[in-house]
């Protein structure tokens, strides 16, 4: 399942050059925002209990252990906090000609047509070109409500700013993975390929391009009390 890579305590991890996981101090991801790497390529619909209950509890216990009561937050460089403020103000004061709803509709239709469950190289490559159009449209986006109180226009624009980037990354990752696995079903690569693709995809948006790397899948247990369950074909 997709999400921010974490260890089983919910601590966010970053990949190093020697392929080892390094903890990002103080940063945690919990629930469906995280990828602990227990569900493989997919999980049954609505079955989030492991992520939410088991690892959610583990994350809470870990946070209680490492965060001292009444401790102050470490100083954050003003240059970093300013990035968030600048993004907020840029979108709030956007005076382009294209409403957010128009760009969002284009994004939704592109993802539905070009990145549905069943896909192939042709339709995904077409989708990569199409999804860049609403992304480029961010430069001409219009936010009519400039207020700071219950501004749904601004909220929807902030949401779209996130969604369009996730859409670009999703499309690129799907086009890059030359196999079928879980809910990723390629008409041109119908079989799962554990030899070449038994790994997590890591993706970074860089403008209109996507940088792709990989992270190993855990194929071991932390104790001898339970056995490792190898992946199986998804059949019903």
What label would you give each PLM region?
Residues 1, 5-29, 33-236:
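Glycine- and aromatic-enriched mobile tails/lids
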């Amino acid at each position: 399942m997709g999400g921010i890579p974490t260890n089983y305590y919910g601590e966010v991890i970053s990949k190093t050059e020697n392929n080892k996981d390094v903890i990002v101090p103080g940063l945690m991801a919990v629930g469906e925002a995280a990828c602990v790497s227990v569900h493989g390529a997919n999980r049954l619909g609505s079955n989030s209990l492991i992520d939410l209950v088991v690892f959610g509890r583990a994350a809470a216990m870990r946070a209680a252990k490492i965060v001292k009561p009444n401790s102050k937050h470490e100083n954050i460089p003003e240059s970093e906090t300013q990035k968030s403020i600048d993004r907020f103000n840029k979108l709030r004061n956007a005076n382009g000609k294209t409403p957010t709803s128009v760009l969002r509709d284009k994004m939704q239709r592109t993802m539905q047509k070009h990145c549905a469950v069943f896909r192939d190289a042709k339709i995904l490559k077409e989708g990569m070109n199409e999804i860049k159009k609403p992304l480029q449209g961010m430069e001409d986006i219009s936010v009519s409500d400039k207020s700071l109180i219950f501004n749904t226009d601004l909220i929807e624009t902030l949401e779209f700013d996130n969604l369009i980037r996730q859409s670009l990354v999703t499309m690129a990752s799907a086009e890059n993975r030359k196999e079928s696995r879980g809910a990723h079903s390629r008409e041109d690569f119908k079989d799962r390929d554990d030899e070449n693709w038994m790994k997590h995809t890591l993706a970074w948006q860089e403008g209109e391009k996507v940088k792709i790397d990989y992270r190993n899948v855990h194929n071991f247990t932390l104790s001898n009390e339970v056995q490792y369950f190898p992946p199986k074909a998804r059949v019903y």
